[in-house]
UniProtKB/Swiss-Prot annotation:
Name of the protein in its database record: DNA nucleotidylexotransferase
Catalytic activity annotation: DNA(n) + a 2'-deoxyribonucleoside 5'-triphosphate = DNA(n+1) + diphosphate
Involved in DNA binding as annotated region, ranges: 258-262
Any Pfam family matching the protein: DNA_pol_lambd_f
Protein family according to the UniProt entry: Belongs to the DNA polymerase type-X family.
Modified residues (Phosphoserine): S134
Enzyme Commission number(s): 2.7.7.31
Any GO BP annotation: double-strand break repair via nonhomologous end joining
Gene: DNTT
Source organism of this protein record: Eulemur macaco (Black lemur)
Amino acid sequence: MDPLQTAHAGPRKKRPRQTGASMASTPQDVRFQDLVLFILEKKMGSTRRTFLTELARRKGFRVENEFSDSVTHIVAENNSGSDVLEWLQVQKIKASSQLEVLDVSWLIECMRTGKPVETTGKHQLVARSDCSASPNPGPQKTPPLAVQKISQYACQRRTTLNNCNHVFTDAFEILAENYEFKENEGCAVTFLRAASVLKSLPFTIITMRDTEGIPCLEDKVKCIIEEIIEDGESSEVKAVLNDERYQSFKLFTSVFGVGLKTSEKWFRMGFRTLSKIRSDKSLTFTRMQRAGFHYYEDLVSCVTRAEAEAVSVLVKEAVWAFLPDAFVTMTGGFRRGKKIGHDVDFLITSPGSTEEEEEQLLHKVMNLWEKKGLLLYCDLVESTFEKLKLPSRKVDALDHFQKCFLILKLHHQRVVDSQKSSQQDGKTWKAIRVDLVMCPYERRAFALLGWTGSRQFERDLRRYATHERRMMLDNHGLWDKTKRIFLKAESEEEIFAHLGLDYIEPSERNA
């Protein structure tokens, strides 16, 4: 049986309802003084009412706990106009003719825009003039808010760093990571795809109706979304975060050079802390792992954009000392606009160099840094690239270009706006992880596209090429299976054009 299905097989336990005591209002937070809202609990439930009330107040709306003469807008869910008017009569409340009786879709749209929207049309359950009349209008169903056509492929969606659905995507990424630790790729991809599509949405999901028409949301994913909407968190995510195996794998894999196999081995041996692993004399470590432990504190801390820019200057100075015409491009998350990362990636290519000069460049750069005392660790992997070899069928395949995985010493004085607080214990430098990739000039567009990411964007780009265009794409090239030829490209824009896709800027590839 599918492990994901078993995880959601039983009915979810409902949490205790929150009382109205938690629904206090602070006048100084009210941005829209002319509007006074009352959210009807009937057919909605107290938990959801509390959630919407708190959300509206955070957005600057005044929401009353009890109905009063000051209320200007009454919001209801799954109620017709006559239902609301009947409720008002039962409560012996005489509604003003100016009272707006609105479907919850109005409030949701207000939350998305961050300000009040037009009340007329689809949101209105009762016309203003009917509010004081007898409740005889027929039921008026409000259709779900239309979700524009969203592609299942990340390469057809524009995903910036402005994520409106962190509460859901963070949960999905934790679950995906847990399945990756268990080497269950299928389940991991399910949650990664769901996280990817929610990151592209220009609005926050507030109700399950908002998920209608959105691709990549399987039933097990929607179950998590529903629980977070109702309870504010996922019990399954909470269980994962408290799971000893997950905590151990998360800790072990934070060490440079430690993968799943080593983590599994250490966990089975009973290790739960890095200090115990470091001090155990029976364990042997690879050269990469020894470097990972030695510089652990620096490597586990995030690399800032200022530090990345300083490393960029360092790399360009070294490369240009040997190949003055070389192009050095920062790739990865920093090219996509991120402010922090775990390492800094660079793509190097030279239009005027010979094959021998390309092969020797990284060796010369390493020797230069070693002489300057900047090279703390180096693992150079020689190129196995073959020009006539077809692109890989695997969506996660690594490329065959020459590359170097490094740890460099970055002096604080080279960093613009360097915080003095980081210079603790008299230490004047920080160890930074750096990846250098050397590629042939004619393949630079494909390599740049692949190394820019994100991981899910690249996966979907390759899936799209295979399933929709009968092509094969990887970091080396693009093969047309119908014409049986390699398609040339001088830029990323040309690759998108070959695939029949609108060009997407790096800052919109944060899938």
